């Protein structure tokens, strides 16, 4: 990519770079995850308020290498006001994308799922789990681990309600346990496939499944946002 026109984007993370610049990690509509240098302004001023997470932007990136230049940016005035547990859930989603997406590989479905997740999280009384799971499953699909949860991966047999199955990144849905596999009941797999979170226990089962898969892909790298969420929940519960 040499230079593209304005495209929708969200800030995932920013960090100081050299004496008076910042590197801003973005999830963009056209180019996927991109890192760009924001020049000038000085450390004392920090990153401009419009370049904060959970604010929809239009950005123009330039440069030939993997590290781009942030040539132009403007807000669309769409902001997702996350607070409390929803804020830490949003930081978790941002950290996942920073650590697992490859740079400059278009991933429109992940971008759309991210927007949808922010909508879930910004509701007045948000149900965090559906919003989190939506982005996690889109990310797994993007990374090449999308699975039809309604069929056994090796045999093609239809998943049955009353049978316990094993799921792993390498083997998908199976009746045979594998290293790092997680046990999921058949009716929960069917609910997960249809994103039918009204089925009791389906969200909990989906969380166990995505947690195991994402931890394996992270390869032992910690997620700081998880620790922040634990600390917050511990504090609020007294």
Swiss-Prot record:
One of its GO terms (cellular component) is bacterial nucleoid. The keyword DNA repair applies. One of its GO terms (biological process) is DNA recombination. Keywords: DNA damage, DNA recombination, DNA repair. It comes from the Bacteria. Belongs to the RecO family. Involved in DNA repair and RecF pathway recombination. This is DNA repair protein RecO. It comes from Hahella chejuensis (strain KCTC 2396). The gene is recO.
């Amino acid at each position: 990519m040499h230079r593209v026109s304005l495209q929708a984007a969200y800030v995932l993370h920013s960090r100081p770079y050299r004496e008076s610049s910042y590197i801003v990690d973005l999830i963009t509509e056209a180019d996927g995850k991109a890192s760009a240098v924001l020049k000038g302004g000085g450390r004392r001023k920090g990153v401009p308020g419009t370049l904060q997470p959970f604010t929809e932007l239009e950005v123009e990136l330039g440069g030939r290498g993997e590290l781009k230049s942030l040539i132009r940016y403007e807000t669309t005035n769409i902001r997702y006001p996350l607070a409390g547990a929803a804020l830490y859930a949003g930081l978790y989603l941002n950290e996942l994308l920073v650590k697992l997406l490859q740079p400059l590989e278009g991933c429109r479905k992940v971008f759309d799922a991210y927007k949808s997740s922010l909508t879930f999280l910004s509701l007045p009384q948000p149900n965090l789990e559906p919003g989190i799971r939506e982005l996690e499953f889109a990310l797994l699909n993007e990374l090449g681990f999308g699975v039809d949860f309604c069929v056994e991966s090796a045999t093609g047999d239809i998943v049955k309600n009353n049978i316990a199955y094993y799921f792993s990144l390498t083997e998908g849905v199976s009746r045979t346990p594998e290293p790092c596999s997680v046990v999921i009941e058949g009716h929960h797999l069917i609910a997960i496939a249809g994103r039918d979170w009204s089925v009791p226990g389906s969200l909990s089962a989906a969380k166990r499944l995505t947690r195991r898969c994402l931890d394996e892909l992270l390869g032992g790298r910690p997620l700081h946002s998880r620790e922040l969420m634990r600390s917050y929940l511990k504090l609020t519960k007294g």
